[in-house]
Every structure is written in structure tokens, then in C-alpha cells.
UniProtKB/Swiss-Prot annotation:
NCBIfam families: S15_bact. GO terms for molecular function: rRNA binding; structural constituent of ribosome. GO terms for cellular component: cytosolic small ribosomal subunit. Part of the 30S ribosomal subunit. Forms a bridge to the 50S subunit in the 70S ribosome, contacting the 23S rRNA. Belongs to the universal ribosomal protein uS15 family. This is Small ribosomal subunit protein uS15. It holds the Pfam family Ribosomal_S15. Gene3D superfamilies: 6.10.250.3130, S15/NS1, RNA-binding. One of its GO terms (biological process) is translation. The lineage of its organism: Bacteria, Bacillati, Cyanobacteriota, Cyanophyceae, Gloeobacterales. One of the primary rRNA binding proteins, it binds directly to 16S rRNA where it helps nucleate assembly of the platform of the 30S subunit by binding and bridging several RNA helices of the 16S rRNA. Forms an intersubunit bridge (bridge B4) with the 23S rRNA of the 50S subunit in the ribosome. PANTHER family: RIBOSOMAL PROTEIN S15, BACTERIAL AND ORGANELLAR (PTHR23321), SMALL RIBOSOMAL SUBUNIT PROTEIN US15M (PTHR23321:SF26). Keywords: Ribonucleoprotein, Ribosomal protein, RNA-binding, rRNA-binding.
Length: 89
């Protein structure tokens, strides 16, 4: 199930870097993490849903790329984001 508009606005408001920010790496990673958590819960109850599993792996790869970009260019923002999201990195 995709993110609702209200949930997206909530995530943007929480993780935005400046007032009009909607596409910074922090916001993108937060949205991907929320979607990843939803898909993980879905797959716990539907373990044979392989198309959703493939989508989950694609989302994880995209989040990994964005986190690598942040780690390489803005290490302090990267560490703050990982702490706020509770990721194991």
C-alpha cells in the first residue's frame, strides 16, 4: 500500500532541511524507510508474495544509494539521519 498524502506531508515536515524542502536525501530516505517498514510487515503475513519482495529489495537498494551519497558528502547529516530513523548502519 502506498504512502498516503497525509503521511507524506508528516514525513516531509519532520525531515525537511529548509522550509520548501521536499526532495532532499533526508526526506527521500525517510519516505523510503516508511515504505520499507510497510512492505516488511506485509511480507511477514504473506511470505510467498515474491513480487512485493522484489519491490522491497529495489526500495532497499535505492535507500542504500541515497545513504551512501549522504555519507560521502555530508557525514554529519548522514549520522543524524541514521540516528533519527534508527537504522543499523
Amino acid at each position: 500500500m502506498p504512502l498516503t498524502q497525509d503521511r507524506k506531508q508528516e514525513l516531509i515536515g519532520t525531515y525537511q532541511v529548509h522550509e520548501t524542502d521536499t526532495g532532499s536525501p533526508e526526506v527521500q530516505v525517510a519516505m523510503l524507510s516508511d515504505r520499507i517498514n510497510q512492505l516488511t510487515e506485509h511480507l511477514r503475513s504473506h511470505p510467498k508474495d515474491f513480487s512485493s519482495r522484489r519491490g522491497l529489495l529495489k526500495l532497499i537498494g535505492r535507500r542504500k544509494q541515497l545513504l551512501a551519497y549522504l555519507a560521502a558528502n555530508e557525514a554529519d547529516r548522514y549520522r543524524a539521519l541514521v540516528d533519527r530513523l534508527g537504522l543499523r548502519r
